[in-house]
């Protein structure tokens, strides 16, 4: 078994699904944003504000290469922009948690939106969402309809890997 890599826009449920998959499959769960945040000693928002998005993307790209060297399979929850890296290919089996923009925004309360620097301006966020759609689909081994909630997404992933 390869790594199971969850991709999708901010708020699509990657972190929650990763935890459930980890429990169901008895695999360790890794969260790329959390790993970067712990290593740098700043939240993702603080990294963007203090070090810039380019530095965050560099940390992300380097982490992908590092994760490729792990010998045992993991469930990996990724940041929404990870699909911008050409080295994502080969990390594992990727599952795109697909959801429309309006549903994503409804799922995130104000506090959650404040943690995500790229959601400050909803018009810009929607443009980013639309731009990334093709990248998510291009990088996906499988597309998960994430609108049906966590349990539904979990069932879909488990069916694909059965």
UniProtKB/Swiss-Prot annotation:
Binds 1 Mg(2+) ion per subunit. The keyword Nucleotide-binding applies. It comes from the Bacteria. The gene is aroK. GO terms for biological process: amino acid biosynthetic process; aromatic amino acid family biosynthetic process; chorismate biosynthetic process. Coiled coil: none annotated. Mg(2+) binds at residue 15. This is Shikimate kinase. It is found in: Cytoplasm. Gene3D superfamilies: P-loop containing nucleotide triphosphate hydrolases. Belongs to the shikimate kinase family. GO terms for molecular function: ATP binding; magnesium ion binding; shikimate kinase activity. InterPro entries: P-loop_NTPase, Shikimate/glucono_kinase, Shikimate_kinase/TSH1, Shikimate_kinase_CS. Substrate binds at residues 33, 57, 80, 132. One of its GO terms (cellular component) is cytosol.
């Amino acid at each position: 078994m390869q790594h199971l890599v969850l991709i999708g826009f901010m708020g699509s449920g990657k972190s929650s699904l990763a935890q459930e998959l980890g429990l169901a499959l008895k695999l360790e769960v890794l969260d790329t944003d959390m790993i970067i945040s712990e290593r740098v000693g700043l939240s993702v928002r603080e990294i963007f504000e203090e070090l810039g998005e380019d530095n965050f993307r560099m940390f992300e790209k380097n982490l992908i290469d590092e994760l490729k060297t792990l010998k045992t399979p993991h469930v990996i929850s990724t940041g929404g922009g990870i699909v911008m890296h050409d080295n994502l290919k080969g990390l594992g089996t990727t599952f795109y948690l697909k959801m429309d923009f309006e549903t994503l925004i409804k799922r995130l309360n104000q506090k959650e939106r404040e943690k995500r620097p790229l959601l400050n301006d909803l018009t810009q966020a929607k443009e980013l969402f639309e731009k990334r759609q093709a990248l998510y689909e291009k990088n996906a081994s499988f597309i998960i309809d994430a609108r049906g909630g966590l349990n539904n997404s979990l069932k879909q992933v488990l069916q694909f890997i059965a």
